[in-house]
Structures are given as C-alpha cells and as structure tokens.
A protein has these predicted regions:
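Short cysteine clusters
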Residues: 64
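Cysteine-based protein phosphatase catalytic domain of the PTP/DSP
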Residues: 1-60, 77-112, 116-120, 127
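Glycine-rich nucleophile elbow surrounding the catalytic serine of serine-hydrolase chemistry
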Residues: 68-73
C-alpha cells in the first residue's frame, strides 16, 4: 500500500502496516452473536476513519483477513451513510463492485438492517 494512502485494518495484522503513517485499526471478529461487543460503535468508528482519510484527500484501503465479510460490512455501512442508501441498495452496490463479497455473518446483517439503518435515517434527517 502506498505510504500516502489511508489504511483501515479490521483484523489483527501483527507487524504488517506497523510503520504505515496513515493507519487506523478497528478490530472486529467475523463471528456470530455477542463476540463483537458494541458492534454498532465499532462500525461507526471504522466508517469515521474512512471519512477522515477521505477528507484529508487520501485514497483509502479497507481490509480484513479475507476481504469478504468484515470489509464489505464496513463498506456497506459507509455507502449507506454517505449516499443515504438502504442496506439492500448497499448490498447491490458492494456485490457489483467486489467479487469476493459474501454475507455469512448474520450479526453483521442484523446491525445494518436495524441499528445502522436507524442511524443513517437520523443523520440524513439532520443534514440540510
């Protein structure tokens, strides 16, 4: 990854990216149930990291171990918030853009369908 890119890591990376100057680690597990306490807030932190890098004029790399579930969970949330889209629309967008996309983590889907959708709606009501 070029040094001027922002990197949002969603998994344990060991020493990878340790010296990368623009990096945010937001750890989440690709697991069902309560293995991700406060998942909504972790998701919001990841989306805010993407936006912060973009506001700095950086290209952004969002990644997890396999690039299938956590990465697309965060990218769907970002798209929903930035574009005012529904989870179904974000699902279509990611599916069209990313061939590795998979949806096996029901907990992620539930957060996007409920808490995140409510958050997106509330934010867009407040925006002029």
């Amino acid at each position: 990854v070029p040094n001027d890119f922002g990197v949002v890591s969603l998994c344990i990376t060991d020493d990878r990216f340790i010296h990368h100057p623009y990096r945010r680690g937001v750890y989440m597990r690709d697991s069902e149930g309560d293995r991700n306490p406060e998942l909504f807030f972790v998701l919001r932190e990841a989306v805010e990291a993407i936006d912060a890098f973009l506001q700095e004029g950086r290209q952004v790399v969002v990644h997890c171990h396999g690039g299938r579930s956590r990465t697309t969970f965060v990218l769907k949330a970002w798209y929903m918030l930035r574009e005012g889209k529904t989870h179904a629309e974000a699902h279509q967008w990611v599916g069209d853009e990313w061939p590795l996309y998979e949806t096996w983590t029901r907990t992620f889907l539930d957060v996007l369908d409920n808490e995140w959708s409510d958050y997106v709606e509330a934010v867009h009501r407040e925006w002029p």
